[in-house]
Amino acid sequence: MAVQFTRIAVKIGSNVLARKDGTLDVTRMSALVDQVAELRKAGVEVILISSGAVASGRSEIKPSKKLDSVEQRQLFSAVGQAKLINRYYELFREHGIPVGQVLTTKESFGTRRHYLNQRNCMMVMLENGVIPIVNENDTISVTELMFTDNDELSGMIASMMDMQALIILSNIDGIYNGSPSTPGTQVIREVEQGKDLSDYIQTEKSGFGRGGMLTKTTIARKVADEGITVIIANGKKDHILVDLLQHPAETVCTRFIPAEGGVSSVKKWIAHSEGFAKGELHLNEQAVKVLKGQKAVSLLPVGVVRIEGEFEKDDIVKIKIGRAHV
């Protein structure tokens, strides 16, 4: 089987894995696992970023008292993640494919050391034929430091692991040029660099997850800017993963065209790390001019006019001139 990509990250949304009543759609899970197994046989390396833990736990347990939103998320994800990963384990075992669970938090991307530790872990898994199944660790995530949703997490994973493509599976065919319920509305098949989609994006959240099309589009643009193809497609369609890689021209989806040229690993990390800045460096105009030049240069103390915050070696800081970010 000839395929378009050989290294892909696949994000499976809650609305793909959950039925209308919130229970886990095992039939859909099984179909997606079968497709991943088929891609593996064709030589494709796959990382799964799977939602569904909270939705799975919600249908499994009835709280004995009223819980706030944080308590609900922690309880449902703790119960649901065990159920979810066990189901993946059983389904992939039928194909003789080992899987490994990777639970992460947004804080784990905040330092270079933790970032590289995660990367090395998943690299070893892939090298040994293990499919990483990634999800946010909702049981310990602090609300202020949570991912917007697993769309954001999938973008950071695809970037960190230097994947050729990120496939975001939702319950719709892609981004439409109007309301999907309006007759004649069509899926936007390609999004070129710089194309404005603001008139087409609806801000509704998904039924069982925290995300929506606005988040998907924002993440897709950022990842595509780093040279990675991003595809938004319908995960409830039969054979969707195989069709996307084997028959890309005939398969309905929205494809974000990647920027040309590669981006270094460090720059990819920094691109997704604005929220992790520990402090600010305010520079004079000459220092800013030098930093924006084509050559790789070091920032000298003489160019710094003010320092804010507390930070250490390898921490991320914001560079400013006046009130503007550089």
Question: Which residues does each PLM region occupy?
Answer:
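C-terminal catalytic "cap/lid" subdomain
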Residues: 1-98, 102-323
